[in-house]
């Protein structure tokens, strides 16, 4: 009897269990997702922190999934702590290293010396491990959470329908525009504070809907996408509006930064976020060269 050899893949969205995994991700994003209050005293520094994370990820050739996970950890940690200004950059870097340990190959995990141009050279590995431990303890060591990028990889496989390629000569052009636009909207979703309050699967579905609408594909929300995502078109209107508004305000004529890869090297079991915690101070040594601010 011939063996049924199946193609092996490290991408969960290409496996026969993709539907089950997607349902699992959606279940836990709803049950365990924290409430985001946008109340960090350093929230005005968020654009700089996100830009720094992207820059390091580009240098280390990290995936888009890793970037989204790092920003997610940073957002919720900042929202629940009164961080000193001179520790916030180190916290963002620690979130990136934790994300890399989950989503990336060990060789791509950034080293502390990567940040020497931003933080003090006096920062030791011991100090840095303490910061990482603070973050892990806050999330109760559950830091592999579903992000927009995780869901996007699954939804992208269901983006097109047969009627989209009525004119076959434009198929390659359409696919190229699709890939660039998806990445652009993902970047835009990272920049929006208001979108943090939405479930990642809803933001990802809104990116797909907005992209199809922008490309002029009819219908812009297909029955297949409705079935796969579990969302009706009307469910995504508000999220699409916020996404489009953010693109208009911040991404006009800005080249797409394709420095990091579009997908994760493989699926990691999503770890559940801890429940909402009481706001607290973080006790980290003064190890960053910048002006100290009061709690």
Show which residues each predicted segment covers.
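Acidic, serine/threonine-rich low-complexity regulatory regions at protein termini
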Residues: 1-295
């Amino acid at each position: 009897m011939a063996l049924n050899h199946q193609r092996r893949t490290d991408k969960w969205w290409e496996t026969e269990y993709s539907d089950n995994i997607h349902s699992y991700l959606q279940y836990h994003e709803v049950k365990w997702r924290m409430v985001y209050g946008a109340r960090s005293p350093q929230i005005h520094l968020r654009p700089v922190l996100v830009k720094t994370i992207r820059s390091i990820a580009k240098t280390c050739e990290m995936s888009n999934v890793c970037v989204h996970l790092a920003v997610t950890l940073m957002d919720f940690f900042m929202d629940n702590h009164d961080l000193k200004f001179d520790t916030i950059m180190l916290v963002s870097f620690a979130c990136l290293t934790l994300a890399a340990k989950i989503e990336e190959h060990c060789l791509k995990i950034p080293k502390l010396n990567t940040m020497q141009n931003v933080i003090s050279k006096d920062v030791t590995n011991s100090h840095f491990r303490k910061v990482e431990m603070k973050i892990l303890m806050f999330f109760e060591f559950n830091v592999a959470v579903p992000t927009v990028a995780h869901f996007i990889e699954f939804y992208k496989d269901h983006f097109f329908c047969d009627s989209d390629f009525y004119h076959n000569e434009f198929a390659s052009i359409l696919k190229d525009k699709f890939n660039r636009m998806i990445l652009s909207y993902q970047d835009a979703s990272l920049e929006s504070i208001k979108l943090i309050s939405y479930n990642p699967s809803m933001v990802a579905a809104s990116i797909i809907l907005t992209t199809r609408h922008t490309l002029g594909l009819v219908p812009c929300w297909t029955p297949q996408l409705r079935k796969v995502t579990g969302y009706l078109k009307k469910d995504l209107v508000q999220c699409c509006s916020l996404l489009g508004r953010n693109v208009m305000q911040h991404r006009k004529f800005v080249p797409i930064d394709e420095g990091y890869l579009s997908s994760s090297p493989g699926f990691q079991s999503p770890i559940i976020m801890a429940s909402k915690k009481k706001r607290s101070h973080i006790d980290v040594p003064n190890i960053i060269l910048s002006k100290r601010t009061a709690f």
